[in-house]
């Protein structure tokens, strides 16, 4: 990803945890952290281990709830002019269920978690789809 492990750890873990502690964890706050698909403590990839540790440690803080969102592919939004990376292959997303969401679905799912809660603390692509239609 173009940075040292130390820099990545500082950016992804330390800054997030400092922010979470600085806002003063409160029992009525919901913290939503976007980690991404493939996040795992047992992964060989440093980014994945770091994101997983961040999710775990956020859950230990005294928030009402802390969710780790793990989106994967992002479908382009209507009218999007420039597609980079996997966005160029957005037509594949319709054929691979559980692989992608729209940015609108992710936003609605986050609002649903904050307003109504969710039984899973790790929210994957399919959960995002469900949550985006769930709590109004």
Residues covered by each model-derived region:
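NAD(P)H-binding glycine-rich loop region in Rossmannoid oxidoreductase-like domains
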Residues: 1-18, 22
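A short helix->loop->beta-strand "cap" motif at the edges of active sites that frequently abuts
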Residues: 26-29, 63-64
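A short, flexible beta-alpha/helix-coil linker loop
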Residues: 1-2, 37-41
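Oxidoreductase cofactor-interface core, primarily capturing Rossmann-like NAD(P)-dependent enzymes
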Residues: 41-136
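SDR active-site strand-loop-helix element
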Residues: 31-37, 69-71
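Internal, well-ordered alpha-helical scaffold/interface segments
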Residues: 17-21, 29-32, 52, 56
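Residue-level signal for alpha-helix termini/capping positions
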Residues: 24-25, 115
């Amino acid at each position: 990803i173009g940075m040292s492990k130390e820099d990545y750890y500082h950016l992804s873990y330390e800054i997030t945890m400092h922010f979470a502690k600085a806002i003063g964890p409160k029992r009525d706050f919901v913290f939503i952290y976007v980690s991404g698909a493939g996040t795992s403590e047992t992964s060989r990839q440093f980014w994945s281990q770091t994101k997983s540790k961040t999710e775990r440690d956020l859950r230990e803080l005294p928030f009402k709830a802390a969710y780790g969102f793990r989106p994967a592919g992002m479908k382009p939004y209507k009218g999007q002019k420039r597609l980079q990376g996997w966005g160029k292959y957005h037509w594949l997303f319709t054929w691979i269920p559980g692989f992608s969401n729209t940015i609108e679905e992710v936003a609605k799912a986050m609002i649903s978690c904050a307003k109504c809660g969710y039984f899973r603390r790790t929210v994957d692509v399919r959960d995002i789809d469900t949550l985006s239609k769930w709590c109004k």
